[in-house]
């Protein structure tokens, strides 16, 4: 037996099939070097939609994974798509398309992969070899759980394979605590959503408002502060309840792997265990500060930050970005925000993201006429911006990856959440850890006219929004801002030195 074959026999093969959403795909790519550091003999196969070839290839290059002998990167889908996707933005329609694509790639290729047969790579346009041993661990995007996991289980059973099935869950654990676990106070999400879907279709909206949208019962979700149920959707209807409900029956058969700091989800871990669900939380899967590609390149962005640092000092820029899937601010709200920042002579960067065309035209005009107070970008290199000494604040939707980047760079968060885990991170960080502030007057829908659990009435008027923005931005340099900066610093230190995360990494590697 050659040394190579001996190593291969002892190796464990991990198959990763993440979502095409950049917020799910990028951490899955960054997971690979972290896995190899802990399990040097591991073999990895990752299936990536060819639509994200340009972005994914750059991320893989940071770690030389594109030419690593133990890593097979295989692209699927329609090759022409890769020419259309040179940015990270994906809307809800695109998100659902990626889910369908994952189901198809599993249907077409899973049996071939476990048999170590070649499969088709859409980027190079031909079949490529797979690893010589079947996967011992298969981890697939969580939103496809009801469809892909049973498919794989059936093939595993037919072939007599013992494969550990896992679902990739790059979401904060405190959101999944709401959708999966039993709250310490109040009825569960599952109970509420089941009642919604049991209602006749013509009564579905009424049932939704009764169970979630307008419900004023108090819930205390694990690892979160108490809220009224209607506060769980502050800015839009629940986009993901049908997906979540479909996942729930399957979860006890799989391991849910979160790219989230484990110390922030210890109550959730216990609550999930009580339901027979394993939930390792393996911490941030983000580029390390030392990786190439994490520095600003010369251009108007770097010039703006460097100039502001020289003129106004450290922590003087507010970076505004709402992620790559949703854009919670409407035209009027965004206009008020920009007016307040400009009137207060603040320095700011706005990532236009998925804002409407009308909102983009308005924002560009206001910023271009702001006498250099701000700049706008279609897409922003977020981590390098947060690393820059001039950047002091992050006005964010509060997605998991953005939040962990803020923790790593010590940048306090000003939350404007849209949906899903954003809402619960915006609950946990300000109210439990004093590491951010959540804007309340920008809430809409059934939240308007109602009083939050903390006693603030959401008026939602133009004046109320303007007043809240003015108050908060005016005191960022005072004790209010200093407390938030200290809170995020403490969380960042705990994230980088988290024994709970290392315990969960060990559990994942040993699946």
Predicted feature descriptions by range:
Residues 1-246, 273, 287-321, 326-511:
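Glycosyltransferase specificity loop/lid
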Residues 53, 240, 253-276:
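A short, active-site helix/loop in glycosyltransferases that binds the activated sugar's phosphate group
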Residues 135, 251-254:
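Short, proline-enriched alpha-helix->beta-strand connector loops that line the catalytic pocket
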Residues 164-167, 266, 278-281:
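Short, well-ordered strand-loop elements centered on a beta-strand within folded domains, enriched
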Residues 257-258, 276-288:
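Donor nucleotide-sugar binding/catalytic pocket of nucleotide-sugar-dependent glycosyltransferases
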